């Protein structure tokens, strides 16, 4: 596996450059346990970061030993202008940079209010009903096959007022919630991210949520159940290479086995592949 990953690394590096050169990237991260060689039996909690390109239906996985700000350096060091995330604090770094935009995810907001239904049914239901209206607009866009300015126009006319009304509702209602209750947490999660949640209405290519990157990261979750951990940090990096390239195949309906065989057989005959090769 390590030898194959080494041969595939030039392809993986090209994929990284595609991410760095992209305008709009979705981001998420998930734990990836790694065996600690200096402490037999101990596991280090590493992270796989997934940078997903909606334009190309392409995931790119990058292993980091932690979940700190260094995880987003690939994005910050490139030409990426817009990052969409679940609102995890490290992505806030993007908001501080000139000419950059950080979007958040309405699916995560909806999830918070679903969790709060048992705690405060009336208010949780109100929020969920309003969020459903936002998704109805997105379904209409898809059904009517709208493009470009037509998408922006519809979102600004229908979705944006709903977002702002939710903001005002949240501002009014939060004061009467019990601190740290599920409904209070849901409201606070939404209220502190309203600008990042509203931004998707202004560009047709932006998505209402981060669901594509979450779908692309699921195979890693399944892998954790089967493999449990990587044997070293180097092995975790190799896993990131395979997850990235096989994920690209899967997302673009390419047979991963055939693609892998074709590429590895081609690379066998090239001692030091150039960027073009």
List each model region and its residues:
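Gly/Pro-rich turn-and-neighbor structural signature
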Residues: 1-74, 78, 142-201, 205
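Helix-rich, typically C-terminal accessory recognition domains appended to large enzymatic cores
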Residues: 169-216, 220-226, 232-263
């Amino acid at each position: 596996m390590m030898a194959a990953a080494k041969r595939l690394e030039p392809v993986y590096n090209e994929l990284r450059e595609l991410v760095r050169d992209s305008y709009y990237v979705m981001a998420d991260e998930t734990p990836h346990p790694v065996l600690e060689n200096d402490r037999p039996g101990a596991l280090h909690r590493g992270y796989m970061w997934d940078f997903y390109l909606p334009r190309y239906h392409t995931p790119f996985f990058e292993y980091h030993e932690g979940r700190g700000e260094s995880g987003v350096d690939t994005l910050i060091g490139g030409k990426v202008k817009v990052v969409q995330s679940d609102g995890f604090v490290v992505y806030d770094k993007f908001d501080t940079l000139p000419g950059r935009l950080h979007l958040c995810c309405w699916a995560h907001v909806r999830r918070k209010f679903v969790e709060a239904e048992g705690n405060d049914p009336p208010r949780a239901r109100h929020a969920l009903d309003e969020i459903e209206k936002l998704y109805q607009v997105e379904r209409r866009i898809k059904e009517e096959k709208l493009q470009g300015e037509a998408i922006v126009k519809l979102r600004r006319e229908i979705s944006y007022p709903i977002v702002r009304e939710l903001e005002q509702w949240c501002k009014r209602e939060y004061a009467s919630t019990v601190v740290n209750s599920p409904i209070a947490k849901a409201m606070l999660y939404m209220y502190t991210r309203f600008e990042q949640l509203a931004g998707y209405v202004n560009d047709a290519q932006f998505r209402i949520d981060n669901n594509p990157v979450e779908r692309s990261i699921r195979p890693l979750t399944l892998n954790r159940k089967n493999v449990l951990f990587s044997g070293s940090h180097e092995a975790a990096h190799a896993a990131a290479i395979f997850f990235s390239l096989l994920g690209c195949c899967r997302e673009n309906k390419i047979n991963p086995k055939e693609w892998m065989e074709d590429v590895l057989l081609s690379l066998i005959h090239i001692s030091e592949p150039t960027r073009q090769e």
